Amino acid sequence: MTTNKNLDENISFEEALSELEEIVKKIDNGQETLEAAVNSFERGILLKNHCEKKLKEARLKIEKITKLADSTITLEEVEV
């Protein structure tokens, strides 16, 4: 597991969430040393933030689609 302060922005929501769930299990079960747990916690924060960003992007895209008044569907990339 990578514990660097940079997270690959190309990681999918599902991959990030799965890794975050594994980190939570390890910390909850006490399977790591204190130092490893702190590193895992730091990685978990990065993953949580990444998941929140992906969810926000999806929500904004859905809002744009549903606000179209003339019933035509167009997708426009949203920068967050």
Curated annotation (Swiss-Prot):
Gene: xseB
Subunit organization: Heterooligomer composed of large and small subunits.
Main location: cytoplasm
GO cellular component terms, A-Z: cytosol; exodeoxyribonuclease VII complex
Protein name, as recorded: Exodeoxyribonuclease 7 small subunit
GO BP annotations listed: DNA catabolic process
Location relative to the cell: Cytoplasm
Task performed by this protein: Bidirectionally degrades single-stranded DNA into large acid-insoluble oligonucleotides, which are then degraded further into small acid-soluble oligonucleotides.
Molecular function in Gene Ontology: exodeoxyribonuclease VII activity
Cytoplasm in keyword set: yes
